[in-house]
A protein has these predicted regions:
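Conserved small/polar residues in nucleotide/adenosyl-binding loops
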Residues: 152
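Acidic/His-rich, divalent-metal-binding segments that scaffold phosphate/diphosphate chemistry
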Residues: 1-80
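Post-HEXXH active-site segment of zinc metalloproteases
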Residues: 79-89, 99-100
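Inter-helical turn/loop segments and adjacent helix faces that build the functional surface
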Residues: 52, 95-99
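Short alpha-helical catalytic segment bearing the HExxH-like zincin motif
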Residues: 62-66, 83-84, 109, 128
Length: 153
C-alpha cells in the first residue's frame, strides 16, 4: 500500500462527496454524516482491529474504508453502501494503492449497511461496528423527523 489514510483525507473529491452527502441527509432529517463522523468511524475501525491484534496494513485499510464509507450518500441514501463502494473504486483505482487493497476497501464499504451487507472480512466487520458506535448526541441535525418533513417542506 502506497496511499495512506492521511493522503486519503486530503483528496478533495472524497471530502466533497462527504460534504454533499451530509448536506443531503441534513435536508432529509438524518443525523450528521460529515467529515467528523467519517474521521470518528475511521478511528474506531482502526482501534477495533488494533485491539484484535491485526497488522498495520489491515488497520490502515479499515481506517480508509471508515473515512470513505458514506460517500454514497452524495447520490442517494437508499443503497448508499453500494453506490459508495462504486465511487470508492473509481477514486482509489487512480491512486498508488494496489488493486487488491482497493477491492478490500470497496467490499467493506459495500457491506457496511446493516440492511444489505454482511461482515465478510475483518475490515468490513470493523467498519460495521465502528459506524454503529458513533452515537454522539450532537449528530442530530434536524429535530423534525424525515418522515414528517414532507408536510413541513
Amino acid at each position: 500500500m502506497k496511499t495512506t489514510y492521511k493522503e486519503i483525507r486530503e483528496i478533495e473529491e472524497i471530502n466533497l462527496l462527504i460534504e454533499q452527502g451530509n448536506a443531503t441527509l441534513k435536508e432529509l432529517g438524518y443525523t450528521e454524516h460529515s467529515k467528523k463522523h467519517a474521521a470518528k468511524v475511521s478511528d474506531t475501525a482502526g482501534k477495533i482491529l488494533t485491539e484484535l491484534g491485526y497488522g498495520k496494513h489491515k488497520i490502515e485499510l479499515a481506517r480508509i474504508a471508515g473515512y470513505m464509507h458514506d460517500i454514497g450518500n452524495s447520490i442517494n441514501r437508499h443503497d448508499h453502501a453500494h453506490s459508495g463502494a462504486l465511487l470508492a473504486y473509481q477514486i482509489l483505482k487512480d491512486t498508488e494503492m494496489s488493486l487488491k487493497d482497493v477491492l478490500v476497501i470497496m467490499t467493506a464499504i459495500g457491506h457496511h449497511d446493516e440492511a444489505t451487507g454482511d461482515a465478510v472480512d475483518p475490515v468490513s466487520a470493523a467498519l460495521i461496528l465502528a459506524d454503529k458506535t458513533d452515537v454522539r448526541r450532537n449528530r442530530v441535525q434536524n429535530p423534525v423527523p424525515a418522515t414528517d418533513r414532507k408536510s413541513v417542506v
